[in-house]
Amino acid sequence: DLVDKSIKLGMPAIALTDHGCMYGIKELLDYCKKTNKKLKEKAQEEGTEFVPFKPIVGVEAYCARRSRLQRDKDLKAVNAEGKAYIVDQSGWHLILLAKNMQGYRNLCRIVSASFMEDSYYRRPRIDRDLLEQYHEGLICCSACLGGELPQKIMEGMSAMGGENGNINSENTFQAAEETIEWYKNLFGEDYYIEIQRHQTTKPGADQHVYQVQREVNPVLVELAKKHSVKVVATNDVHFVEEEHAEAHDHLVCVSTNHFIDDENR
């Protein structure tokens, strides 16, 4: 179990940020309540200080690239090689965490709105308009490589031929910096830039994500310094134990309509 494993590893808290939904939140809160009761009883018996385990309510939202009300099935863009491709309109990833009851209520409003018929396209989507309406009480993090900020950094790097270049060079990361300023202006001190580093030596495992993280992370850190935004290191956890990896891989294939042996899935 996620909570038990976290406690075993000495972690004081964990955030549950399921993709696009909050279905697991009640189960998390109920389980933490029972667990904290047991931890308190154990602390009293041993005469030690009781430190409750903290569940953090959140979601990894899909933020539409433009408006959640637009469904541009054939929207195209051009990559660094000059080839046109269909833009995925399901949205960038964005982490939202409730820091108080107002934040929890706003999180519920945002997620509920994302499932409405006019918002849903492939996935439940939010947009900047929703964030402007319901940002109070929320902590916002830039998310994984699927987030708007990392994606715009990668676009800047691609335009430069894949080299990091000079952070301060004009227009190199202009879109990324505009993204930072927009979220910083909205969330203030509650906006964080995430860095992740998921290295694996397991045979057959995908090494591409780690390679990209190594390229993007230094840019994230430098831009965070430049714009006075705090950096937080996170783990993009999708299963508890290593032996669960295969089952998770099968689940991903089901959700993305792919086969295990598909290339470039």
Tell me the role of every PLM-derived stretch.
Residues 1-265:
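Phosphodiester-processing cores and adjacent nucleic acid-binding clamps
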